[in-house]
Swiss-Prot record:
Listed name of the protein: Large ribosomal subunit protein uL29
Gene3D superfamilies the UniProt entry points to: 1.10.287.310
Species: Streptococcus pneumoniae serotype 4 (strain ATCC BAA-334 / TIGR4)
UniProt keyword annotation of Ribosomal protein present: yes
Gene name per UniProt: rpmC
A single BP term in Gene Ontology: translation
Keywords: Ribonucleoprotein, Ribosomal protein
Length: 68
């Protein structure tokens, strides 16, 4: 993600409720699990997607902690 995309993503996250953030986090965790499984079996083509999903999860957790 480019810097502008990251800023847009975080801005969007800050507009969501805690429940919506938790839902989005769970979706990304499922995607991360699937990506790790693909990587382990040698089927993953976009290896950078792993890093991107991890960072998105971290951003969601950061926004959640800011709201507390």
């Amino acid at each position: 993600m480019k810097l502008n995309e990251v800023k847009e993503f975080v801005k969007e996250l800050r507009g969501l409720s805690q429940e919506e953030l938790a839902k989005r986090e769970n979706e990304l965790k499922k995607e991360l699990f699937e990506l790790r499984f693909q990587a382990a079996t040698g089927q993953l083509e976009q290896t950078a997607r792993l890093k991107e999903v991890k960072k998105q999860i971290a951003r969601i957790k950061t926004v959640q902690s800011e709201a507390k």
